[in-house]
Amino acid sequence: FWKDVYGVDMSVMTPTVMKEPLVDYVNKDMIMSDSCKILDIDLVTCKKEDVNFSSKYSLKMRYNDRVHGLVAWFDTAFSRLTHPTVLSTSPYRTGTHWKQTVLYLE
């Protein structure tokens, strides 16, 4: 991607961009695959060691193109409330200040 940004070689930016995830709003139309859950945590009962995890996942691509990164978001269910609700940071929902996290691939 960085070798041809609208005809300009921006590859000098690659090390800086790859260093840390980008927290920003992601347009749902930019997502090339189905989504999948990688972790389910009960925040009422979880322990410190529960957040150190690995997860196998599979993504089904909707069309053939180059993948530049992975997009992460979370959904939090407040199911014990009088009126249960879900806070979703998905790019398919109304935006929140939490945004999404982009993990760029080399």
Task: For each feature predicted by the language model, list its residue ranges.
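Class I SAM-binding transferase module
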Residues: 1-106
